[in-house]
């Protein structure tokens, strides 16, 4: 059943729940790899730097998706963009799970990151259509699920990899993206394009916005530094935890 949504008229609780779930599962794609880097290095017989490129390229892909795919939501049907991204994300995750060459993992990780930007469609959608009295609550729910996906994905991938190997993490993730596609296919309305400008002009407008609002520049710089520090910790932690004195036999 496809929901009919109008600006500021409220969003059904069932749709909010589904969008929240999809938000957490989508962003998780960018973070499954961080606890798995040591296992990947051993499996592909590459050094730590080559394995760490998997995490780096995933984040580079996510940045490119935010920069170049999200603006397309003003020019094209967001429903079609979201569904297309889910298909591409599922395929790239499956490719990582089946890869026998680290270079395939690099390319697929870049695509995974770029196509896992669905939360940045969902959160504005919820804000735009929620009733004024519920906007902050609903956006808070969506942001909470985003953070649960970011943090919980690392725990989940570590547990799955410990039980069935790191490749199983990506097979399950591909299945979850297929599930999200089916869920969004059934419930998302058309969400037609809202702008009539060209893609080039839309991209130029991003630069004008950045120049016009100094607080945006400050907030962006702070977020970049905080996120960089956070990523630096997690991307290196997997390698350290596979060395003494953190080995299971030494801890026990």
Q: Where are the predicted features?
A:
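Cytoplasmic helix-loop-helix junction between adjacent transmembrane helices
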Residues: 109-144
């Amino acid at each position: 059943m496809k929901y009919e949504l109008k600006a500021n008229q409220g969003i059904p609780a069932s749709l909010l729940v589904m969008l929240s779930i999809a938000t957490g599962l989508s962003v998780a794609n960018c973070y499954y790899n961080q606890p798995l880097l040591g296992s990947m290095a051993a499996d592909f017989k590459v050094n730590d730097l080559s394995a760490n490129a998997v995490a780096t390229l995933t984040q580079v892909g996510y940045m490119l998706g935010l920069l170049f795919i999200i603006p397309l939501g003003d020019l094209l049907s967001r429903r079609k963009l979201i569904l297309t991204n889910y298909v591409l994300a599922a395929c790239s995750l499956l490719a990582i799970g089946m890869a026998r060459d680290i270079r395939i993992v690099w390319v697929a990780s870049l695509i995974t990151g770029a196509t896992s930007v669905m939360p940045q469609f969902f959160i504005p959608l919820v804000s735009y259509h929620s009733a004024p009295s519920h906007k902050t609550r609903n956006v808070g729910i969506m942001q909470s699920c985003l953070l649960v996906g970011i943090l919980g994905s690392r725990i989940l991938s570590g547990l799955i990899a410990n039980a069935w190997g790191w490749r199983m993490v990506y097979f399950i993730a591909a299945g979850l993206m297929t599930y999200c596609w089916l869920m969004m296919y059934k419930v998302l309305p058309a969400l037609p394009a809202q702008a009539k400008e060209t893609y080039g002009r839309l991209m130029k407008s991003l630069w004008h916005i950045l120049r016009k609002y100094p607080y945006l520049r400050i907030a962006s710089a702070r977020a970049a530094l905080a996120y960089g520090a956070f990523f630096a910790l997690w991307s290196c932690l997997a390698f350290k935890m596979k060395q003494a004195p953190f080995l299971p036999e030494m801890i026990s």
